[in-house]
């Protein structure tokens, strides 16, 4: 109880930041060098989590802001997957938070389902639909991690980083061998089997997002909390293997670090919480006031009891963390392909994207009227990443996302990508779709991440899930034309679909999965697609906005944009496919 009481007092500083409005970390103090988590810090955080609860099934993990595993603790009753789930929820807290607004794994679940708000039928999908399929640890380049300008670890599983015995040879994570890919979850596939690789744990039950039609009962994993020091994100802590309320209780106490000064030093600015479409994003339980959170933390959850560190073992011994690199994390460099993007082209696209970001009003930063801080990536025709640029304090999950979005934007805009998508739509297990008209000979439609998201959900059009409301009195909602591709992606980490060969090499390594939420455009020279631009780090409309303006000079011909085409289901109903969606009044107000 000594640890829990000390932590409860300190953690209120963090909780204040998610509830009340006052001041905020000034823009000129956002990003830059931050104190790293030391091995002693990690041990203190895990000790607090361990002593908060005595459950024999508990596991806890600490990661730095890059998602690098710094320490994992588990009790004998924890099942095989629980330590990796703790790592995954810790990453969710660390990699989604920013210096101006703490977000937790509860927050991420709220904004990643088939409905927004969760549990309300016939409402649009949440912005980050499919987020569990990102950050699975896929290889970035055939040359390995040496292509990065600074150390930037891939978020793999414990065995993928340390080996089967958490200290031997690491296991790989690539299309041909995914044994070392991240193992969050548990989440089930379409056959009811546990998916082997889930990068981000939110509590999503299965690929159909079961439970989204039950207001107040949507499944969630709320045990991932960011760790702050001096107003800057330096890592995250995750607790798993216990009931949701217990995991959140222990993780939030542990985030205070037993009084070691880990705190969000200033409360958030107006309006005191991040709002999307007028809805307050949750951080801790159902609380919306400081009094509620304080009382919750000061009162031990019913039926729980304190624990001892000696009741478990360190699966991964505590170690020091890393800084999260900023600016050019990779590149800039030219494509090696004839007629491809030059280094000058790449720099121009990055510079344009950064300039647009700095004038774009952020959705996830406070106080309001702050600039968006994006992570931006450019890919060439081979899927080679030519640049990865992280603006100061950009969300770290966005690095994997931006690179993958860039690759997807190019690949699915090629003729090969078109044929793969057309075939999947035509052979959908539940509904057969016809995609018309066909693009010009030898070409594909110019496709974005928004297009892929729109047609890749278990409901089509997205959010429409009551079949009896339709004129034809359908017995059940229909899956999207590319929902089967989402299922394939969920089962097969680090691939771009069943036909992603890029010239016939099925083991091609320049693949890192598919991103199912918006923020990308293909890059063209004339009517030839030569690469892709991926943007991540704020609201998805803001990501689309920066993608569009950042790619100035490389837009597709209007006649090749996918919004010239429609999907038609077996009953003859037509749905036009979207290209981009831009925010209203996107720029910072003077």
Q: What spans do the regions from the language model cover?
A:
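Bacterial N-terminal signal peptides that target proteins for export
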Residues: 1-8
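Bacterial N-terminal signal peptides
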Residues: 8-19
């Amino acid at each position: 109880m000594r640890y829990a009481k000390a932590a409860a007092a300190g953690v209120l500083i963090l909780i204040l930041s998610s509830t009340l409005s006052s001041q905020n970390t000034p823009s000129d103090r956002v990003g830059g060098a931050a104190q790293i988590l030391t091995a002693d810090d990690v041990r203190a955080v895990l000790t607090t989590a361990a002593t908060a609860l005595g459950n024999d099934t508990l596991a806890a993990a600490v990661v730095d802001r890059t998602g690098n595993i710094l320490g994992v603790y588990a009790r004998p009753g924890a099942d095989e997957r629980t330590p990796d789930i703790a790592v995954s929820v810790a990453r969710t807290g660390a990699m989604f938070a920013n210096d101006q607004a703490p977000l937790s794994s509860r927050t991420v679940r709220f904004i990643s389902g088939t409905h927004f708000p969760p549990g309300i039928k016939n409402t649009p999908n949440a912005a980050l639909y499919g987020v569990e399929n990102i950050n699975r640890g896929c290889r970035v380049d055939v040359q390995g991690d040496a292509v990065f300008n600074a150390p930037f670890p891939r978020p793999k599983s414990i065995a993928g980083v340390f080996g089967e015995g958490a200290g031997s040879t690491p296991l790989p994570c690539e299309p041909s061998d995914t044994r070392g890919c991240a193992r969050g979850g548990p989440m089930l596939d379409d056959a009811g089997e546990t998916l082997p690789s889930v990068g981000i744990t939110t509590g999503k039950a299965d690929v159909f997002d079961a439970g989204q039609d039950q207001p107040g009962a949507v499944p969630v994993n709320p045990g991932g909390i960011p760790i702050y020091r001096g107003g800057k994100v330096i890592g995250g802590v995750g607790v798993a293997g216990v009931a949701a309320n217990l995991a959140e209780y222990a993780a939030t106490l542990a985030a205070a670090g037993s009084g070691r000064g880990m705190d969000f030093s200033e409360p958030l600015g107006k309006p005191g919480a991040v709002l999307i479409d007028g809805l307050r994003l949750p951080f801790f339980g159902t609380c919306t006031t400081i009094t509620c959170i304080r009382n919750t933390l000061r009162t031990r959850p019913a039926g729980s009891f304190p624990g001892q560190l000696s009741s478990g073992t360190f699966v991964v011994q505590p170690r020091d963390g890393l800084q999260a690199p900023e600016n050019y994390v990779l590149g800039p460099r030219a494509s090696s392909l004839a007629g491809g993007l030059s280094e000058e082209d790449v720099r121009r696209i990055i510079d344009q994207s950064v300039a647009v970001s700095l004038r774009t009003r952020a959705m996830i930063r406070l106080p309001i009227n702050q600039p968006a801080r994006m992570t931006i990536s450019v890919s060439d025709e081979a899927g080679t990443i030519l640049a990865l640029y992280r603006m100061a304090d950009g969300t770290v999950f966005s690095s994997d996302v931006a690179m993958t979005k860039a690759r997807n934007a190019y690949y699915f805009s090629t003729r090969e990508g078109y044929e793969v998508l057309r075939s999947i739509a035509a052979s959908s297990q539940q509904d057969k779709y016809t995609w018309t008209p066909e693009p010009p000979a030898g070409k594909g439609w110019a496709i974005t991440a928004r297009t892929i998201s729109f047609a890749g959900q278990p409901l089509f059009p997205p959010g429409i899930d009551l079949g009896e409301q339709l004129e034809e009195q359908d017995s059940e909602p229909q899956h999207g034309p590319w929902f089967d591709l989402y299922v394939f992606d969920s089962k097969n980490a680090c691939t771009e679909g069943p036909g992603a060969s890029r010239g016939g090499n099925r083991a091609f390594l320049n693949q890192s999965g598919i991103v199912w939420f918006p923020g990308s455009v293909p890059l063209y020279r004339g009517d030839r697609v030569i690469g892709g631009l991926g943007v991540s780090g704020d609201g998805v409309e803001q990501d689309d906005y920066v993608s569009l303006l950042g790619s100035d000079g490389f837009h597709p011909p209007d006649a090749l944009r996918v919004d010239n085409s429609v999907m038609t289901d077996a009953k003859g109903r037509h749905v036009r496919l979207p290209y981009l969606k831009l925010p209203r009044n996107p720029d910072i107000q003077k």
